[in-house]
Amino acid sequence: YEAALVSNDVAVLDELFRNDRRTLRYGIGENLYGYDAITAFRAARSPVGLNRRTDKTTITTFGRDTAVASTLFYRESMPGRVGRQMQTWIRCPEGWRIVAAHVSIIDEPKGPAT
């Protein structure tokens, strides 16, 4: 996913989201409901400035067919801020797919991480 994201490989990103009207993605400035809305967003998104550094990536599994991927990310274009990303993945007949995603950016917390 990460390689496809930073290189703006729209075909791979589209494939990794579940093709279902119930799939959703809450982005930094948009709420996308359904696979069609997510793919339309990806098709229109600028490929500029997507590089980032990830940190504290955690994969939490629930049985063999459900996982949540959580990570922090940093971009040179947003000093003093930290991005947060969570994705719920399920194992489908065609492979692992994202069914829910959330991306947000906050001011970098001061002090030790908790």
Model features per residue range: what roles?
Residues 17, 29, 58, 72-73, ...:
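A mature extracytoplasmic/lumenal domain signature
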Residues 28, 36-81:
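Surface-exposed, charged secondary-structure patches
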Residues 5-8, 30:
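Conserved short acidic donor-positioning loop in nucleotide-sugar-dependent glycosyltransferases
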Residues 2-3, 58:
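Amphipathic alpha-helical repeat scaffolds
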Residues 12, 24, 67-68, 97:
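General beta-strand recognition
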